[in-house]
Structure formats: C-alpha cells, structure tokens
C-alpha cells in the first residue's frame, strides 16, 4: 500500500516537472498579436526600441565597411556568409520588435520604425543576391548609408 502511494507521488512529481519543460515561443509578426499583454511605459518602450535600432545600425555600418573592402580583393564568399548572418540577426530583431506592445501614443512611430527596419532588411537581401551574382555592389553603400540615417532618425523620435 505504501509502495503504491510512493508511485503516485513519483508520477505526480514527474508530471509536474514535464509540464514545465515546454519551450515558450513568442508570437510572430504574421500572427498580428503582441507577445506582451500590456503596453510598456514610454520610458521602457524607448529603451527597448533604441536597443533594437542599435542592433540594426551596428549591422548596417558593418556592411558599409565591408563594401569599402570589396574593391580590395576582399573575399566575396566570406562577405556573403557574414551578410547572411547580419540578415538573420536583423530579421530576428524585426520579429521581436513587431511583437512588442508599444507605449501609449507610439503606434504611429512603431509603424514607421518597422517600415524603416524592413527597408534595411530588403536592401541587405538585395545586396546578398547581387554579391552571389558577382554584380557590382558599390551602390549599396549609399543605400546602407540612407538606412543608417533613417534608423538613427527613428531613434531620435523615442528620445524626446
């Protein structure tokens, strides 16, 4: 009888342990849902967005530096790999940003920020495709510079 109770206790504890092991995944931007239940405060959202925009500006400025080196017998295959890594980071950052509930009154700024982020992602994707085709990519420096300026301009909206 005691042995039977022990098994029930073990089974109960085991089921509790297993129920807490499921991986929690945030909502995707495609679902149209926010991963947070409540709006962040204006300060919290400003800090969060500026952190996300910093990820974008760092990746874009790195690619701008790489474009300068491509004309100096730079390893194009290596640049494709690095640019693809940057693209993955930017896409993940965009997905996270799109699912965070903005602060009160920041809906329009959020939408503008997402457009600027998606534009940078689009330029980076085109850059990778042109690198792969061995096309001239020197024109992307200006695109990335414009993206950088747009991203830093968006950061300024949240610092007011």
Residue ranges and their predicted role:
Residues 1-2:
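Short, Lys/Arg-enriched N-terminal segments with co-localized hydrophobic residues
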Residues 5-11:
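Sec-dependent signal peptide recognition
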Residues 22-24:
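Bacterial signal peptide processing site
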Residues 31-78, 118-160:
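C-terminal amphipathic alpha-helix
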Residues 77-115, 160:
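Short, solvent-exposed, charged loop/turn and helix-capping segments
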């Amino acid at each position: 009888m005691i042995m039977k109770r022990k098994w029930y206790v073990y089974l109960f504890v085991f089921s509790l342990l297993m129920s807490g092991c499921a991986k929690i995944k945030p909502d995707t931007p495609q679902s149209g849902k926010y991963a947070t239940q409540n709006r962040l405060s204006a300060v919290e959202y400003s800090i969060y967005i500026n952190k996300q925009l910093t990820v974008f500006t760092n990746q874009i400025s790195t690619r701008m530096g790489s474009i300068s080196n491509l004309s100096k017998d730079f390893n194009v295959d290596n640049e494709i790999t690095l640019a693809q890594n940057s693209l993955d980071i930017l896409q993940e950052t965009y997905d996270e940003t799109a699912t965070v509930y903005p602060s009160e009154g920041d809906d329009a700024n959020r939408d503008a920020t997402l457009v600027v982020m998606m534009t940078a992602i689009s330029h980076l994707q085109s850059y990778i495709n042109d690198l792969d085709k061995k096309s001239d990519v020197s024109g992307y420096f200006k695109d990335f510079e414009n993206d950088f300026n747009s991203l830093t301009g968006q950061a300024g909206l949240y610092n007011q």
